[in-house]
Amino acid sequence: MAADVEGDVYVLVEHPFEYTGKDGRLIAIQPNERCRLLRRSTEHWWHVRREPGGRPFYLPAQYVRELPALGDPVPAPQPSVLQQRPTVPEPLAYDYRFVSTPVGADGSSAEPRGRASSLCGPARQRTSGQRNSLAPGGPACLYLRPAAPVRPAQSLDDLARGGTAPPAGLLGSAGHFKASSVAGSWVCPRPLARSDSENVYEAIPDLRCPPRAKSPKQVDEPPEPVYANVERQPQVTSPRSAAAPPRLSPVWETHTDAGTGRPYYYNPDTGVTTWESPFEAPEGATSPTTSRASVGSGESLETEWGQYWDEESGRVFFYNPLTGETVWEDETEELEDDPEEQLEMQPSLSPRSPGQQRPPTPETDYPELLTSYPEEDYSPVGSFSDLGPTSPLVAPPGWSCQITPEKQMLYTNQFTQEQWVRLEDQEGKPYFYNPEDSSVQWELPQVPVPAPRSGRKSSQDSDTPAQASPPEEKIKTLDKAGVLHRTKTVDKGKRLRKKHWNASWTVLEGGVLTFFKDSKTSAASGLRQPSKLSTPEYTVELRGASLSWAPKDKSSKKNVLELRSRDGSEYLIQHDSEAIISTWHKAIAEGIEELSADLPQREEGEPSSADFGSSERLGSWKEEDVRPNAASPSLNPGSQESDLSRVRHKLRKFLQRRPTLQSLREKGYIKDQVFGCALAQLCERERSPVPRFVQQCIRTVEARGLDIDGLYRISGNLATIQKLRYKVDHDERLDLDDGRWEDVHVITGALKLFFRELPEPLFPFSHFHQFIAAIKLQDPAQRSRCVRDLVRTLPAPNHDTLRLLIQHLCRVIEHGEQNRMSVQNVAIVFGPTLLRPEMEEASMPMTMVFQNQVVELILHQCADIFPPH
């Protein structure tokens, strides 16, 4: 909700940000800029203005910090005289003003660079004329002028003995500062290049000692400490033991970076974000209290440096937790030669150095909130998530790294100018691609570099424990990669009906050929690989495989390779360029030859899984008897005749060893199915006069009601019927009340399918012509008597099954007014199913008419043909 701002309220920029407005204007802000707050448009965006009369614009609220409003200075209390007993000190009153950066003696600005801009400068050569109250153009540096006299201190110990700290309640009343974080925020450390004679001013709230009496001169002209960005600067403290727990701040929040998944910590009061946990000591520091002087400088510096190991680059670097400065170990040796360069060293790294990337603001965790931003004067091109790579690699020795316009990392060899592009597969694993020759590798080629100087080390380096070198990983190189057309024709010995040619990114690595899924952005003739690989679709192991040029009967395309794997699968690989497919043929053939040379030779006559297309064996074969081919037959055209004779011998031996069908049934490997089984065998196996499936279907249909419209005439879902058939064939326990078979037309369709799948219909082939001759009789009585006698001559399973079915259909006909199934309709449905000739005849239309008449007559004469017991 928008909120107006009363009075002059200013904000201080803490993080860089830029975006393009709807009018094309580029809005960019830098840290330590100060803008006037006009309106709090939303929770996430504020309306600000730089200069009076300037054009206003929007800024993200999390990237700026609201500065406290100015108040009238409080008169300083009179200094008190020391008493014999301790007394409670009077609280200090502060007024807040903005001062410009002091100008050095040479006329240049004394404002530090990089992260040092958050540190305050020394309080020297400062006059009242240098201060500007809310100057529009001056940098935002918070100036606190204590009303009580402050004695210059030469050391922290001296300050601790006689210093007076402002009460925590006074500091917390400023609105933006909290008493819980004062100890880690109110500090004014000296720059590294300044002399030790400079005054250090600190506010230490832990001390409650009475103030000392000051001279009149000190009261009239007190030194004025300057505090800049006080809430972001940690306090300079003496080195503590590793076991001492750090001081905790209860205002830290834990968030997760949506881009990398790494947790980071955010302070809502100060707006500070950090990768390192504020609740524990940094991990990986082997010597947290190692002095910066041990890196190569003999001076005693105020800050503490920790030595760390970068796992990805294998280099040692030093990190200062107080200033955030990070320096590589080899860079410190170069600084030893130039002391001035060392003093002016800025705490910044390459844009891709670990720890340099500022963590995102909490809005990155909740992208759905971005829709609530104002639509007035900005176009969120530079959104919070567009902060660049969060975990880039450091360039190895001998390589330089830069970001291309496509936001890809380009590594250039400093000696040969060879260039490699760093990409990532779908799992996030990085690899490198050479645009010149389209080669791909997991690692950059190693560049021989001179050994580092060992004589420049400081004597204090021996105190630091030796860093354990990372474990050596086996470098895997890609033999070949590119875009090819491929199709799979045989899947583990089973030939596929259709060939689907697709273009996919293909990678040959370590004896394994991987076909990734369709690449929408690549063509067969393209040289550029997809920026992000998809899921692997086929993986072919070249060990024991064979490769040959595909004959014309396999494919009409040109330049087609046929690859047969050891598990019996076959693939066709094609490319329009003959030169490219020839290089692939050479690379795959060399991989097969190299891997097959290590395979043990098989004895003559031993079967091979590659020969038969499957590793499944029957009979008395042992697992260790099956070994892949020692060499690919197709790679040696001269021995094709001998190979064919050897294959015939193996097939003959295999067929002789093949177990009989009866033995497989006895062992339970093969079970007779219900659908397609002879009716007599099924009844004998189930020990029932009528198949159980027929009984179940009839009971279920009658239980659900015979008044359903179109019963036995309307077809059910064919896919569901096939599922029911599979269930009946493979599972003895069938429950037709399951929700999957709730449609009654599925059950009636399965029952009709059962009778159609019988090897011999319910009216046997031997009785077909007799029934047709009987139905042609002109005398109705004689016709009925002849049909009844023929039905009684049917085999017992056929007779009993026909009795149950006809009686059920008669009950269906009784509900003909509701289900609209008359005798003629039922006869048309079941006539061709129950009665059909063994061989199709020329007069099929007339035969179908007689078939329907036979079933219709049996339905009319059901009580006479099948009398009740």
UniProtKB/Swiss-Prot annotation:
Protein topology in the membrane: Peripheral membrane protein
Modified residues (Phosphoserine): S155, S215, S249, S350, S459, S462, S469, S632
Domain PH: 477-593
Gene Ontology biological process terms in this record: receptor-mediated endocytosis; Rho protein signal transduction; small GTPase-mediated signal transduction
Region (Disordered): 104-137, 275-299, 331-389, 447-474, 598-644
Domain of life: Eukaryota
Annotated site residue numbers, Arginine finger: R713
Skewed-composition ranges (Acidic residues): 331-343
Keyword terms, alphabetized: Cytoplasm, Endocytosis, GTPase activation, Membrane, Phosphoprotein, Repeat, SH3 domain
Entry's localization field: Cytoplasm; Membrane
Bias (Polar residues) ranges: 345-356, 631-642
Domain SH3: 6-69
InterPro entries, alphabetized: PH-like_dom_sf, PH_domain, Rho-GAP, Rho_GTPase_activation_prot, RhoGAP_dom, SH3-like_dom_sf, SH3_domain, WW_dom
Subunit annotation: Interacts with SH3KBP1/CIN85.
Protein name, entry field: Rho GTPase-activating protein 27
Annotated source species: Rattus norvegicus
Lineage of source species: Eukaryota, Metazoa, Chordata, Craniata, Vertebrata
